């Protein structure tokens, strides 16, 4: 009922090593002549298999590796731009909102609150929140000192003030939407995550050596390539297909088949400036996040609302 059987894989000491020893578990898929490749694509996730990010255990025999991306520059200069991060509490005490990107120094910022996504936001007085910069070692959205930064909200003062009554539910801000609006800096070209998977699979499928002369470990042995992803990675595969990345630079087919699971009708918030690949639109949370727009189906159809004609397999 899993990829490896009932034996826990052994974790290498370095993220660049091969999972060895009992890493293949009982090797069921390999005994059927298959090669299993886990490919990182999310540029805001750790790419190391070691330390606290290691996720291969007896109970969880897979690992979703990230990828290391450069910080984008414009003619060598730092890029800044408007960004927004969200906080919704389900209890009375949580009060930390982690920013997904570093806040540019000496720039204005504001915090707003609203009851539902379609309500007009109410600006929270600056005396009711503080921003603390982080070291940027951890992932975006982290609310600790090693994140990019975080906002501490004095929710008790917000609840006590009549100025925000319209954004509350009978005096409670549980479920209310806080937005931190700020000037972000140092975006990463997250869309390269599509190229990374495309080029990796194309290399394994077609090439003998890479541009540095490194040998393809499975050269000549790959006849059919299949991709599968669950939930977020399922949405990624739908986006990958729609954006046209299933054809490599030589116009060769990358994946012969795909099995995106639990992705629903969605794509991802990846190939955008100030993107957040792990985020997605929900009824209340991050409601306006890109990735839940037409097209939804694999076949090419016309959307009656926008008049657009498109499909995930059109390209």
Residue ranges and their predicted role:
Residues 1-315:
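C-terminal His-loop and adjacent cap/lid subdomain of alpha/beta-hydrolase
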